[in-house]
């Protein structure tokens, strides 16, 4: 309920809240994406890095 209300509120008034609504959601996804990226990067680096990168670099 709270999430829907916040989303509807930010989407309804795209004037003042829009400027503040964008930075807030932008920071949210940015942090998780930055943290989620390093995790898969290491995972792929270890799994594919040993086989693919090993042959390319080696």
UniProtKB/Swiss-Prot annotation:
Keyword list, A-Z: Antibiotic resistance
GO biological process, one term: response to antibiotic
Region (Disordered) location: 1-37
Domain of life (superkingdom): Bacteria
Positions with biased composition (Low complexity): 25-37
Name this polypeptide is given: Curromycin resistance protein
